Amino acid sequence: MSFREVLIVGWQYLRAFVLIYLCLLTGNAISSLLPIIIPGSIIGMLILFVLLAFQLIPAHWAKPGCSLLLKNMTLLFLPIGVGVMNYYDQLSQQIIPIVFSCLISTAIVMIIVAYSSHYVHRERPIVGSTSEINNEQQKQEKQEK
């Protein structure tokens, strides 16, 4: 790999992380101005989504940074898991309600996803197809009899 290629790849990662970080900073700034409590990271994610959805910025600008973060997502959850252990006493007292709510919410999500997937992927008639025309002709013949 030549020095030029290293610089190009480095620039692509730098541009992606700067873009993601600018969206985060903008989201934090907007969050501090709002009268309701919405995390700045959520607002920043929505800003990044809008920028990409309306193609205000090309998707390949954010792709290198996003793919790197997604590859290492499990590693990024490690500090959160360690931080939760600071509240071990409180968690151990409430373990049954926590496990129960996790199981119920997981079941609800699975049911909703199943019905949504079934609805989205159902078989739809093709408008103007020969089978549709034949069905309409058969209905008309039955009505005439």
From Swiss-Prot:
Biological classification of the source: Bacteria, Pseudomonadati, Pseudomonadota, Gammaproteobacteria, Enterobacterales
GO (cellular component) term, any one = plasma membrane
What is this protein's name? UPF0299 membrane protein plu1549
User: Which family is this sequence assigned to?
Assistant: Belongs to the UPF0299 family.
- Which residue ranges traverse the bilayer? 6-26, 34-54, 65-85, 95-115
Q: What domain of life does the native source organism fall in?
A: Bacteria
Cellular location(s): Cell inner membrane
Report the PANTHER family cross-referenced here. Answer: HOLIN-LIKE PROTEIN CIDA-RELATED, UPF0299 MEMBRANE PROTEIN YOHJ
Which InterPro entries does the annotation name? LrgA/CidA (IPR005538), Uncharacterised_UPF0299 (IPR022957)
User: Which keywords belong to this entry?
Assistant: Cell inner membrane, Cell membrane, Membrane, Transmembrane, Transmembrane helix
The species this protein belongs to is Photorhabdus laumondii subsp. laumondii (strain DSM 15139 / CIP 105565 / TT01) (Photorhabdus luminescens subsp. laumondii)
**Membrane topology category:** Multi-pass membrane protein
Main localisation, per the record? Answer: membrane
